[in-house]
Amino acid sequence: MIGEQYTSIITGFKSALAVSCIAVSLFLLSPWIAYARLPSSIKSPIKAKGPLSALRACLNEISAGAKTSTRGYELYSKKGQSFAMLNINFRPQVILPPEHVRWLVTQPEDILSHAKASDDADALGYIWPLFDASALHSFSKVLQIDLTRNVTQTEKDVLEEVQHIMDELVGQTESWKEVNMVQAFERIMYQATQRVYVGLPLCRDSTYMGYVKGYARSLGTAMVFAAQLTPWPLRQVTALLAGLPVYYYVLRVRSYLSPLFKERMERLKEKGGTQDDNLEGEPRNLITWMSDGVLSGVGPKSISPSEMVTWLGILALLPTDNLWTTCTNVLLDLLSSESEHAYLHTIREEARTVFASSKESGKPVSHGLHHIDSAIRESLRMNSLSPRSLHRQVVRRGGVVLPDGQKVPTGTWLCVLSGNIQRDEDYYEDAQTYKPFRFVPKLTEAGGDKAPLLPLTNEKYLTFGYGRHACPGRWFSFQVMKIVIAYILANYDIQPLEKRPDNIVFADLNIPHLSHIIRIKRMT
């Protein structure tokens, strides 16, 4: 009897061991299996001749940064050829050359899917199993319409918050003070955007703001970990585990915002009437606009206040880290530029002039800040937050033929190297040189004292994407960054830097170090 039990245990152990060995073998073979599906004629800077070399190539990308993709860009993209890359997540990707950008963004969703690629590129569908992309798209229209339409009010709110924070950080005295640049911009951007999203007094509630930052930070971390750093066979499990802090913080944020959404929607329902009549007397913030969007049919037809908090987090809270990252890059670039160019002086004088004229005319301040606008564009061109963009997945049965004649199978990831395109001498004069006023002539010509008409996206400037899936909040983001930088430079003196510090480059991330200390004082 006992012998039979031992035999049964041993048999079970052998079976479990066999299954485990098969699972591990398939896991280790997965990079090669996926890579081998691509046509043998497609070029690659990676020499993956078998399962081990494919696995090694994936692991090497952890520390390679953009080196491998840049080599592929120089070898193949500049010759109009597509090439294949292996990634940390064990899934190969076909990189298209710059000439194919328009073709890529104009393909129908049933041929090249943006939605499918986004599911894998940001892993939201894995972190939130009930993720509804249609609801996200509906609320993105609210960002496009209401945030842009209420530019004057949002500028006023942002200015009040940046003034309030700078008074606390630096004070009213004219003595030099050391400030952590990243921490300063992080606080400014979170609090200023929250002023627009939820209003006073909540945007200055330290406990609430802690939960907001935790929500955005944990969600961003989970997305990077699940989408970029986890081999795709393990993504479902790791996304759920990485999402545990997200679930905690979203519950905390919901405890503050769900009652606000519920109360605002009930009040708007009672008013009835037209959309403009509904908003009369209501706070001009994103809580109101999202609530009105649901009731007016712009947003999803059926959604709870708690769900609205989730979408607010994904659409509005998550991108906030990109704002302070960009502002830090802009200031690092300006402070380390050669003094004879007088970039800071020009921007400071423009900001003061525009602030003064705006008080008299009532026109939005951001419309006249052409030099700051150009400086932000240039820093984003030089320091692309992500080196790849325009992600698409082939969903057409039987695959698709690329413009260069290569046929790739269903399920293949496609993208372009936006970071390399934006620093290519073929598309930008002196592309490797920082020229903060590079875009000023076109901005002045296109905008005058009105909102700049120079697009934030085109085939050679892909920071915010391109085409119908470009970032819906890009104009608002630019407006906020211009206002913040303009106010700081118009009212504060900052000691220049001897050298521009290098950024942290890891996987598809390119961010400043978090410990930059600057010396700053208030100007009379």
Swiss-Prot record:
Pathway: Secondary metabolite biosynthesis. InterPro entries: Cyt_P450, Cyt_P450_CS, Cyt_P450_E_grp-IV, Cyt_P450_sf. Glycans are attached at residue 150. Its EC number is 1.-.-.-. It holds the Pfam family p450. It is found in: Membrane. Heme binds at residue 471. One of its GO terms (biological process) is secondary metabolic process. Its main location: membrane. GO terms for cellular component: membrane. The chain crosses the membrane at residues 16-36. Keywords: Glycoprotein, Heme, Iron, Membrane, Metal-binding, Monooxygenase, Oxidoreductase, Transmembrane, Transmembrane helix. The lineage of its organism: Eukaryota, Fungi, Dikarya, Ascomycota, Pezizomycotina. Its cofactor is heme. Induction: Expression is regulated by a complex signaling network which may include cross-pathway interactions mediated by sensing of the cluster final products or shared biosynthetic intermediates. One of its GO terms (molecular function) is oxidoreductase activity, acting on paired donors, with incorporation or reduction of molecular oxygen. It is a single-pass membrane protein. It comes from Aspergillus flavus (strain ATCC 200026 / FGSC A1120 / IAM 13836 / NRRL 3357 / JCM 12722 / SRRC 167). Cytochrome P450 monooxygenase; part of the lna gene cluster that mediates the biosynthesis of diastereomeric piperazines. Lna and lnb clusters encode sets of enzymes that produce overlapping sets of previously undescribed metabolites such as piperazinomycin-like metabolites or morpholine. The lna and lnb biosynthetic pathways appear to be part of a signaling network that controls the formation of sclerotia, a resilient overwintering structure. One primary function of the non-canonical nonribosomal peptide synthetases lnaA and lnbA consists in the reduction of L-tyrosine. This is Cytochrome P450 monooxygenase lnaC. Belongs to the cytochrome P450 family.
